[in-house]
Amino acid sequence: ESLSPSRGVAKRKKKQRRNRTTFNSSQLQALERVFERTHYPDAFVREELARRVNLSEARVQVWFQNRRAKFRRNERAMLANRSASLLKSYSQEAAIEQPMAPRPTALSPEYLSWSSSSPYSTVPSYSSSGTATAAQGVNMANSIASLRLKAKEFSLHQNQVPTVN
């Protein structure tokens, strides 16, 4: 079978994927040292670094792009873990702080005596048939826990910000 001329040209024009660059330990040490100082080195710093570690400036530039992406990914994961652990501890505190007395049911006299001006008027009512799901309670606990988490983060942030007198 013979190939048509157009298919032969297309095969020759197809770009070869470049091989993955493998960095040796001294190159990685030098790259990481510069990354500790700045996540965005300028062209002169990249060129000098490339010359010192025997890489092209383009490879150094791509390494920094990838390293910044890794840094952001690790930072997000760390924040997510910290938030999850704080949320877990707050939800455990919320469970401890729950009142021992049962909440009033829809038909209890306490519930019927609440007026629309009551501060509890925005709390969702529980149905008399007992169909109020555990999910509502969980959502309320999560909501309270997330509000406590936000308040704690806010107060921590306020304590870290220097005041100007």
Swiss-Prot record:
| UniProt-listed GO biological process terms | regulation of transcription by RNA polymerase II
How is expression of this protein distributed across tissues? Cranial mesenchyme, limb buds, axial mesoderm, and branchial arches and their derivatives. Also found in the heart especially in the ventricular septum and ductus arteriosus.
Give the Pfam families listed for this entry: Homeodomain, OAR
Positions of the DNA-binding region: 16-75
Arranged from A to Z, the UniProt key words for this protein are: Developmental protein, DNA-binding, Homeobox, Nucleus
Q: Which residues form a coiled coil?
A: none
Motif OAR — list its residue ranges. Answer: 142-155
Q: Which GO terms describe its molecular function?
A: DNA-binding transcription factor activity, RNA polymerase II-specific; RNA polymerase II cis-regulatory region sequence-specific DNA binding
Q: Where is this gene product found?
A: Nucleus
| Disordered: annotated span | 1-24
Bias class Basic residues marks the residues at 9-20
Task: List the PANTHER family hit by this protein, alphabetically.
Answer: PAIRED MESODERM HOMEOBOX PROTEIN 1-RELATED, PAIRED MESODERM HOMEOBOX PROTEIN 2
What does this chain do?
May play a role in development of the heart.
Which family does the record claim for this protein? Belongs to the paired homeobox family.
This chain's protein is named Paired mesoderm homeobox protein 2
Task: Write down the species.
Answer: Gallus gallus (Chicken)
Q: What is the lineage of its organism?
A: Eukaryota, Metazoa, Chordata, Craniata, Vertebrata
Encoding gene per record:
PRRX2
